[in-house]
Amino acid sequence: MLYSVVARKTKNMKQLLSFLAAALFSLGAAASGHGTPADALALINETAAYLADQGPAKTFFEASNPKGRFIHRDLYIVIYDKHGKVMAHGAIPRLVGLNVYDYRDEEDKYFVREILDKARKGQQGPVDYKWIHPLTRQMQAKSAWFRQVGQYVITCGTYK
């Protein structure tokens, strides 16, 4: 009898602690929120300044570091050369070195082509497409913001 009372209270306590942990996690996630277009453009400008100061090699390394200075909430930097080769990727570093010019999203949209074409014309976005959110691992609508800096296009996307 005593065992069942203790077991029941222990189970209830575990449920309560689990609930509280989930609630705190949710509050933290809600407080951090999604990055905004203004945040994305600021991160692009910060990366461009770093590129001018530190050069391509250090910038590509830092932008591909998942714990680096160019990761903010759900924002990360991707840098392409003018042909669509990934020079840096903050969320999926294994894409570095691959040419993704012909990559398409789940709706068959050639989003990298569109980003590079618009960047060549001096535009900064947005290009809308679908991509996997780095924190939730779910497919989501995304808007890419970008800036051409010399021979590179620095991009950062906001999830909707």
Where are the language model's segments positioned?
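Charged/polar low-complexity intrinsically disordered segments
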Residues: K9-K11
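Acidic, Ala/Val/Gly-enriched low-complexity intrinsically disordered segments
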Residues: V5-A7
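Bacterial N-terminal signal peptides
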Residues: S18-S26
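N-terminal membrane-sensor/transducer module of prokaryotic signaling receptors
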Residues: L2, M13-L17, A29-K160
